[in-house]
Amino acid sequence: MIIAVTGTPGVGKTTISKLLAEKLGYEYVNLRDYALEKGIGEMKENELEIDVDELREAFGRDFKGKNVVADGHLSHFLKADLVIVLRANPKLIAERLKERGYGREKLGENVEAELVDVILVEALEENENVIEVDTTGKTPEEVVEEILNLIRRGVKRRVGIVDWSEVYDEVLPYLRL
């Protein structure tokens, strides 16, 4: 089974993916590292630009029939059995990205993406089985337990649980207006 864990930068993808893989006994794959290792994509202005079609094809070939948790904000473009879209309060994302040294423009871009559900919409366009999980105020262990419970219950689709419209005014200073 291939489980793709995706979301806006700062939601906790890597922490959750590693813990989920460990609990399930699955292989953990960081998509950025995988793409670099395979020579998929190129560096442009300090950012790795990845050819999504090439990534999907190579990943499908290399991990077909294996149990894998794929971690990355592009993982929802893979042929996955289940896509987990992690969400977090945009203000929390802004704070985390600020700590990581993100510039104002990139920070605003990501806060806006979370605010308007960009990754969730992309995931739904690409996949049938999409589960949305809000990580706000939860420990990584609590998030993984929630995911495992949903998997055990056979839940294939759960979306629409997050609405950030109430925090719009709080994140306004971070947006690129």
UniProtKB/Swiss-Prot annotation:
Its EC top class is transferase
A Pfam family matched in the record: AAA_18
Per UniProt, ATP binds at 10, 12-15, 100, 138
State the Gene Ontology BP annotations.
ribosomal small subunit biogenesis; rRNA processing
Alphabetized UniProt keyword annotations? ATP-binding, Kinase, Nucleotide-binding, Ribosome biogenesis, rRNA processing, Transferase
Q: Which GO terms of the molecular function aspect are on file?
A: adenylate kinase activity; ATP binding; ATP hydrolysis activity
SUPFAM superfamilies per the UniProt record, alphabetical: P-loop containing nucleoside triphosphate hydrolases (SSF52540)
Q: Which domain of life is it from?
A: Archaea
The region called LID is annotated at 99-109
Reactions it catalyzes: AMP + ATP = 2 ADP; ATP + H2O = ADP + phosphate + H(+)
Q: What is its EC number?
A: 2.7.4.3
Extract the InterPro entries matched here: Adenyl_kinase_AK6, P-loop_NTPase
Q: Which PANTHER family match?
A: ADENYLATE KINASE ISOENZYME 6, POS9-ACTIVATING FACTOR FAP7-RELATED
The record's section on NCBIfam families has:
PRK03839.1
Q: Assembly and partners?
A: Interacts with uS11. Not a structural component of 40S pre-ribosomes, but transiently interacts with them by binding to uS11.
What the protein does comes down to: Broad-specificity nucleoside monophosphate (NMP) kinase that catalyzes the reversible transfer of the terminal phosphate group between nucleoside triphosphates and monophosphates. Also has ATPase activity. Involved in the late maturation steps of the 30S ribosomal particles, specifically 16S rRNA maturation. While NMP activity is not required for ribosome maturation, ATPase activity is. Associates transiently with small ribosomal subunit protein uS11. ATP hydrolysis breaks the interaction with uS11.
Q: Which family does the similarity line name? A: Belongs to the adenylate kinase family. AK6 subfamily.
* Protein's name in the database: Putative adenylate kinase
**Which species is listed as the source?**
Thermococcus kodakarensis (strain ATCC BAA-918 / JCM 12380 / KOD1)
Q: What is the lineage of its organism?
A: Archaea, Methanobacteriati, Methanobacteriota, Thermococci, Thermococcales
